[in-house]
Amino acid sequence: RTGSCANGDDIILAVKGEDVWLYDTLSASFAELGLNYNFDERTKKREELWFMSHQAMLVDGIYIPKLEPERIVSILEWDRSKELMHRTEAICAAMIEAWGYTELLQEIRKFYLWLLSKDEFKELAASGKAPYIAETALRKLYTNVNTQPNELQRYLEVLDFNHIDGCCESVSLQSGKETVENLDAGKESKKETSDKGNKPQNSQVGQGSKEPTKTGTVSKDVNVGSKGKEVPRLQKITKKMNLPTVGGKIILGLDHLLEYKPNQVDLFNTRATKTQFESWYSAVKVEYDLNDEQMGVIMNGFMVWCIDNGTSPDVNGVWVMMDGEEQVEYPLKPIVENAKPTLRQIMHHFSDAAEAYIEMRNSESPYMPRYGLLRNLRDRELARYAFDFYEVTSKTPNRAREAIAQMKAAALAGINSRLFGLDGNISTNSENTERHTARDVNQNMHTLLGMGPPQ
């Protein structure tokens, strides 16, 4: 077959050898349509055909599309972005396009190696953000030939997975014990650490705050081969702060304070302590006369019951759990009486589990806890927060916190708690014959014909 390429519109026509004469007539035929085409550029080799700035290159028995080397080099010259990552990605794109041009690909890799040795790219490479495309990956991309294990072994032989840049000290040793001790830069610091570990803890108040300036991040050693100035690191807690002191000594253990990051909910006084919760669980287990496996089922049922009915201290009687279609009743007295400080503070330990349970129910069918139904909560996305022992934490979304606050305000509206009721031994001698209707303002005032009571 013979191919003919028309420059400009990149049209490739192929005909059999005996039909080459067709090319001689095509120019006139296209001219009748007002198109000026030249079909003089002809070839019998696929490698000499160009289409959309690409030519076919035979590699391992497969024709692959290749750009001109000059166009690939222009990709390397692309440097318009402010992001260093974009520059490295452009180089990787040039690697992909250059596969097949062995010499050009080798030069691109040398250029990439030189670029990564520059100061502005060193940090990028050290953090593992500098991309690279191996020869095996390029061959797989173009030929779809899987990589053999022996080819990957070549990479494993030159990689040191235990090496971390900048993690080791370089120590020069000479003969003589005294010289070695002088050159051991880390010995003194190790000795000080050992002495600190053997020192009694109660030697003085606030011993961890003797030198507050050392409690921050230890600055890295300055490399003698580096240029420029080292960027300073700020201390998290410094002696410039107004810290509590007694007798001129800081009473805080700053070393411990920097590492003291407890779970926030463990400090909430709205949640029962772990000891109180364990005591409640053990007491309920004894009074119900159940084992741990049975208590697991009971706790599931009681948590779901509390989601719908709340954890008010005034609950009494029985709570129910479903066994298929059958209701099984359990007395509330052991659960309420042993709940210290309150039942709601005990149930705060179930907050995350209850939230996940509501979310699971909603994934199967619409489910809104009774607590949310009573407050007329209309947004089903907030159903997971619609129970009165939900524990508000720093992770709770702002919209959910607002909904929880409004539901609590609605639940507490109109409540008037009285310490004492009417003494049963006192009786009144007068009979109240006053008659009121539903339209009256209050029990002491008749209707005002539409006027409300004074505010």
Swiss-Prot record:
Annotated GO biological process: DNA-templated transcription
A Pfam family reported for this protein in Swiss-Prot or TrEMBL: Poty_coat
Reaction equation(s) it catalyzes: RNA(n) + a ribonucleoside 5'-triphosphate = RNA(n+1) + diphosphate
Mod. after translation: Genome polyprotein of potyviruses undergoes post-translational proteolytic processing by the main proteinase NIa-pro resulting in the production of at least ten individual proteins. The P1 proteinase and the HC-pro cleave only their respective C-termini autocatalytically. 6K1 is essential for proper proteolytic separation of P3 from CI.
UniProt GO molecular function: RNA binding; RNA-directed RNA polymerase activity
Site features described as Cleavage, chain residue numbers: 174-175
Keyword entries, A-Z: Capsid protein, Nucleotidyltransferase, RNA-directed RNA polymerase, Transferase, Viral RNA replication, Virion
UniProt similarity note: Belongs to the potyviridae genome polyprotein family.
UniProt name for this protein: Genome polyprotein
Originating species: Watermelon mosaic virus II (isolate Tonga)
Lineage: Viruses, Riboviria, Orthornavirae, Pisuviricota, Stelpaviricetes
